[in-house]
Every structure is written in structure tokens, then in C-alpha cells.
């Protein structure tokens, strides 16, 4: 609350930078990886979702190193964060369906040649028999890329949450949700490595039908 009060003049990407600076979280991205982000034109960024809210902030920051016309598709519960709301396109992750208004916002942003960040898993990585993994990715971003002929840019965030959080996901969804915000503050004074892959042109892999 004290942080919000002393930085109420900041909005959008300026607030993202200030939050990361306040938490002393350094997003480490190589210059070579940043070159994969085009300076102009529509782009869909797809990434794993290892930690929670921090993932979105980190990718907004990463893209903003090259261009500032970026938004992230995020859980509707975060839309109340007014200083960041201009960067969000809210969806109902719990309901499993995307409202028409949100789909229109996504299409408009891409048609205006902006960058749109997706976390296709729809929720934070969970323990599985193969280790900590995202859930099966929702294919909505592929349909959007195909429809509008927008290239994809894969990103991998190299991070994880605490053992306590992972244990809570096996016991109670409510408890794990309460612990989720705590996970971001747990990462104070640390680095967050981000690896950016090569662009995938829409017509290389996907059909528009």
C-alpha cells in the first residue's frame, strides 16, 4: 500500500519497471535474444507460466526493451490493478471460455500492429509425474495467429515457485491461490532469466482454415 501511494503517478510500463526495481528483480535477457523481437508489426508472444503475476510483468518489461505497444492476456482477477490495466486484456481463466469483448480487443491490438503476450496454460505450472510443468496449452493463440497471419515468438521463463506452494496445489486450490502473490515477493533481490526463441511464421506451421 505504501508503494502504491508513493508511485500513484506511474501507469503502464513505467509502473512495471518501478515494481521490478522495487522488488530488486533483474530480468536477464541476452542482446541476441532481444534481437528476436521485431521493432514493428504484429506479434504474438507465447510463454510458460512458472511463477504467476511476475511472469507477465517480466515479459512486458522484456518486450518494452524493444517496443512499447505491448499488452498481455491475463486473468480477469488482475484487472483491478488500475495502474497496469492499460496493459491487460482480461479473460476468465476459470470459466475456460473467452468473452467476445476480449477477443475483439485481442484482434484490434494485433490489427494495429501491436504485440500480444499469451500464457497458453492459463494458470501457473503445477507438479506432475514429469516434474513441474504447465498444464496443456489452450490453442486459442494458434487460431488467432492463423486468422490474422501473425508470427509467434516462443519464450521460456527460467523460474519456479516454492515447495510450499507446490504442496498447497495438491491440497487446496484456495490455499495455493492465497500463496501465489507471496511467491512474487519471495523472489526479491534475485535474477529472472528469460530465453527468447526464434519467430515462427504463421504460414510455416498453421493453416488459416
Locate predicted features.
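A structural motif
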Residues: 109-123
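Conserved nucleotide-cofactor-binding alpha/beta core module
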Residues: 64, 68-111
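Membrane-anchoring hydrophobic helices of lipid-metabolizing enzymes
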Residues: 1-46, 56-58, 65-67, 85-86
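A cross-family acyltransferase "interaction/gating" segment
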Residues: 115, 128-206
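Hydrophobic beta-strand scaffold residues
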Residues: 27, 70-72, 116, 152
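Generic beta-sheet signal
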Residues: 73-75, 91, 119, 147, ...
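Gly/Ser/Thr-rich loops at beta-strand to alpha-helix junctions
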Residues: 49-53, 124-125
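Structural motif
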Residues: 44-46, 90, 117-119
Amino acid at each position: 500500500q505504501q508503494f502504491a501511494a508513493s508511485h500513484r503517478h506511474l501507469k503502464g510500463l513505467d509502473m512495471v519497471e518501478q515494481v521490478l526495481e522495487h522488488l530488486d528483480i533483474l530480468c536477464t535477457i541476452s542482446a541476441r535474444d532481444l534481437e528476436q523481437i521485431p521493432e514493428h508489426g504484429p506479434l504474438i508472444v507465447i510463454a510458460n507460466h512458472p511463477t504467476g503475476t511476475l511472469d507477465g510483468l517480466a515479459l512486458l518489461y522484456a518486450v518494452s526493451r524493444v517496443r512499447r505497444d505491448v499488452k498481455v492476456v491475463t486473468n480477469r482477477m488482475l484487472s483491478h490493478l488500475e495502474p497496469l490495466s492499460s496493459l491487460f486484456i482480461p479473460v476468465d481463466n476459470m470459466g475456460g471460455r473467452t468473452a467476445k469483448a476480449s477477443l475483439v480487443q485481442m484482434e484490434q491490438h494485433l490489427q494495429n500492429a501491436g504485440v500480444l503476450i499469451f500464457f497458453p496454460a492459463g494458470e501457473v505450472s503445477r507438479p506432475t509425474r514429469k516434474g513441474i510443468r504447465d498444464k496443456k496449452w489452450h490453442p486459442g493463440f494458434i487460431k488467432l495467429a492463423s486468422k490474422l497471419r501473425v508470427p509467434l515468438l516462443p519464450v521460456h521463463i527460467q523460474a519456479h515457485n516454492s515447495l510450499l506452494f507446490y504442496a498447497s496445489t495438491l491440497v487446496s486450490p484456495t490455499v495455493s491461490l492465497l500463496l501465489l502473490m507471496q511467491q512474487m515477493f519471495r523472489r526479491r533481490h534475485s535474477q529472472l532469466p528469460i530465453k527468447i526463441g526464434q519467430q515462427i511464421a504463421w504460414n510455416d506451421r498453421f493453416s488459416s482454415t
